[in-house]
């Protein structure tokens, strides 16, 4: 009798009632089977929900990429069309059209490169190549590489930390991409700031690196979304500062690969 009830319950679940579970008590041996069935259904439902989430995420990714590629591509086609139809009044205007098309093409190239990097670091097969290095020395090298760009914006990049040397193991190429993205953001969006601070400290078994500036603060309602792919703080949407919206998502994925965490406050 108990087995018939279990079979009937299984048929009910198999008919699509995946929120149903076998709840009645049976003898000890059969109870193990019932528990296993319930666990299997739970696992199946969770897998299906995860698959739906992944598919939705892929659809959103395609939509966002299509939009971000279409915008500069439309401009390129428009300006090249004007050139093709000889709709320019002077050589200066011709150069202006070609230069604008060139800048839009570069914008598309950056998006494609960032998208490739994002999908690469999100892959479960991505491997790290860890080496032992001095974190403070790495930050000093990064600061030096951005010195000219910072000078143009009347900013200085200051490095601090202890102990020095602060030795650790990580994939320096990927980690360099993280700090590169953070410094670029600090330069782009730190309106009114004069300094970018790079600080590294060993706290217990962790190395904590803080990138900050003394410019305009990020709105509180944007903090929780900063690391979402394609998210841009609305106030920063402009031709001058608009990036791909993938930089911080890439940074988060790289840090996660290292078993670490990243946040903004």
At which residue positions do the language-model features occur?
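HAMP signal relay modules and closely related sensory coiled-coil linkers
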Residues: 2-12, 21-39
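A conserved beta-strand-to-alpha-helix junction within the catalytic ATP-binding
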Residues: 129-144
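Short beta-strand/loop element within the Bergerat-fold HATPase_c
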Residues: 193-205
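Short helix-loop "hinge" at the ATP-lid/N-box region of the Bergerat-fold HATPase_c
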Residues: 186-187
């Amino acid at each position: 009798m108990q087995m018939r009830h279990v079979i009937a319950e299984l048929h009910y679940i198999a008919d699509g009632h995946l929120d149903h579970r076998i709840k009645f008590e049976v003898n000890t041996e059969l109870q193990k089977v019932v528990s296993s069935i319930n666990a299997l259904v739970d696992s199946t439902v969770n897998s299906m929900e995860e698959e739906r989430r992944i598919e939705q995420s892929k659809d959103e990714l395609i939509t966002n990429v299509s939009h971000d590629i279409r915008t500069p591509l439309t401009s390129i086609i428009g300006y090249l069309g004007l050139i093709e139809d000889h709709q320019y009044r002077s050589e200066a205007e011709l150069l202006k059209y070609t230069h604008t098309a060139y800048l839009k093409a570069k914008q598309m190239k950056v998006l494609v490169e960032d998208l490739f990097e994002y999908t690469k670091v999100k892959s479960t097969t991505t491997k790290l190549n860890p080496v032992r290095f001095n974190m403070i020395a790495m930050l000093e090298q990064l600061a030096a590489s951005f010195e000219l760009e910072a000078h143009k914006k009347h900013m200085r990049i200051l490095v601090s930390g202890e102990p020095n040397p602060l030795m650790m193991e990580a994939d320096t190429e990927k980690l360099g991409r993280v700090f590169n993205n953070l410094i670029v953001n600090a330069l782009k969006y730190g309106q009114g700031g004069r300094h970018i601070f790079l600080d590294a400290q060993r706290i217990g078994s962790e190395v904590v690196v803080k990138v900050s500036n003394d410019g305009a603060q990020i709105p509180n309602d944007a903090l929780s979304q900063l690391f979402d792919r394609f998210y841009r703080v609305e106030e920063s949407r402009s031709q001058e500062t608009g990036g791909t919206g993938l930089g911080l998502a890439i940074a988060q994925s790289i840090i996660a690969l290292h078993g670490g965490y990243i946040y903004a406050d």
